Amino acid sequence: STLMLSSAASDVYKRQRKIRFKVGMVFQYPEYQLFEETVYKDISFGPFNKGLSQEEIDKEVRRAAKFTGIKDELLYKSPFDLSGGEKRRAAIAGVIAMDPDVLVLDEPTAGLDPMGRDVLLSQIVRYHKERQNTVLLVSHSMEDIARVADRIVVMNKSKLVMFDETQKVFARGDELEKIGLRIPQITKIMSQLRKRGVDVPEGILTVDSAVDYLLPFIKKEAR
């Protein structure tokens, strides 16, 4: 069989070295991905193996570090002295420094506090908008997915069971629950309000969008 990646229709098996730099992956546990003496060296590993000049490597390292919120003083520390959130950002910086066409993130917010989660998700959204590349987010957090995903692939026992726009997938809440998943909590609350006769539209997936809709409604009812 022939496996193709992107519209260039390159044969993956014949051009493995070139293809490796088209896809970057951040593991769920970044400490397994970090290995160099300093954060700077860790981030520079990918660009170095791409054959970039030292000047280009330095540029990519600092671009990736700035993008992920890694301060200059952290670049020369051991990655193993970082906090959990800092390790996560360092691991992501090391991958995006290669400027991959496809960025794969495996449970990127696992173990982060609410603030760290919000910051990381915002960075992922901004990265996608600025670079206009493909970002694949592997997650069991429906709230995270609702915030960042345009389309959702649902797998069950290694089989594809759904592939559609985010709102359309979450509209199939009963089917999701049967395979052990759930719709975002706020979406479920809005669904319950509709069942009680409140004129609430479908497709509200985040707390922010729920507040935007309900606040004028509540003010009107309070008069």
Q: What does each model-identified segment do?
A:
Residues 78-82, 86:
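Conserved ABC ATPase signature
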Residues 1-9, 13:
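Single conserved hydrophobic/aromatic residue that forms the stacking wall/gate
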Residues 99:
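Conserved catalytic motifs of ABC-family nucleotide-binding domains
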Residues 55-73:
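Conserved ABC ATPase "signature" region
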Residues 145-147:
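A short, surface-exposed alpha-helical micro-motif characterized by mixed small hydrophobic
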Residues 103-106:
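Catalytic Walker B motif of ABC-type/P-loop ATPase nucleotide-binding domains
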